């Protein structure tokens, strides 16, 4: 999606390098034996919670994601609990767009809603995700948002592990826009 990316290849590369340095500096990239939420085994782990709780790194993520959001023609920034919430909140603050939080399941008390924030059928949203592997969590969130009549065409992820999320989201008529890929990060 050329319209949602910064203007030049050099600018994109500069932004990637800035984010990669920040992710490594805050300890978000770890090596060892890990089991991912998808159930897959991995020799590395991207702990974006480290990044989203570090003000400097979160600000870099928010600024870079906001540049892309501004070109997407959306009116709401959404995040899936838990990992997407601080990211979407920061991007909401950076862009001035309203925030929507999508719960993974209906809560059994209070409003019993899967959503925190206003959601109308005419809304156009971008979803924020911390790390994408298979894209399963965000696909589920897109489905429940679309059931309300709202439109989700884009998902911005901080790191795409390049393990099928892009293709799965394309099948769901949504475009994955990674700030960096695992290949970028592990070079």
Curated annotation (Swiss-Prot):
Pfam families for this protein: Pribosyltran
Glycosyltransferase recorded as keyword: yes
Cofactor: Mg(2+)
Residue positions binding orotate: 133, 161
Domain of life: Archaea
Entries under Gene3D superfamilies matching the protein: 3.40.50.2020
GO biological process, one term: UMP biosynthetic process
Assembly with partners or alone: Homodimer.
Function statement: Catalyzes the transfer of a ribosyl phosphate group from 5-phosphoribose 1-diphosphate to orotate, leading to the formation of orotidine monophosphate (OMP).
Family to which this protein belongs: Belongs to the purine/pyrimidine phosphoribosyltransferase family. PyrE subfamily.
Protein name: Orotate phosphoribosyltransferase
Species in which this protein is naturally found: Methanosarcina acetivorans (strain ATCC 35395 / DSM 2834 / JCM 12185 / C2A)
Gene: pyrE
């Amino acid at each position: 999606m050329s319209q949602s990316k910064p203007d030049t290849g050099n600018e994109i590369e500069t932004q990637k390098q800035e984010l990669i340095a920040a992710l490594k500096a805050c300890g978000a990239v770890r090596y060892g034996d890990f089991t991912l939420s998808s159930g897959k085994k991995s020799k590395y782990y991207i702990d974006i919670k480290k990044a989203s709780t570090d003000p400097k790194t979160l600000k870099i993520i928010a600024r870079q994601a906001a540049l892309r959001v501004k070109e997407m023609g959306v009116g709401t920034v959404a995040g899936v609990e838990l990992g997407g919430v601080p990211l979407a909140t920061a991007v909401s603050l950076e862009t001035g767009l309203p925030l929507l939080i999508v719960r993974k399941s209906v809560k059994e008390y209070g409003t019993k809603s899967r959503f925190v924030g206003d959601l109308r059928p005419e809304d156009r949203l971008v979803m924020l995700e911390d790390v994408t592997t298979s894209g399963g969590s965000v696909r589920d969130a897109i489905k429940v948002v679309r059931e309300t009549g709202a439109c989700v065409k884009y998902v911005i992820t901080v790191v795409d592990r390049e393990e099928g999320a892009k293709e799965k989201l394309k099948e769901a008529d949504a475009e994955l826009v990674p700030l960096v890929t695992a290949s970028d990060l592990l070079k």
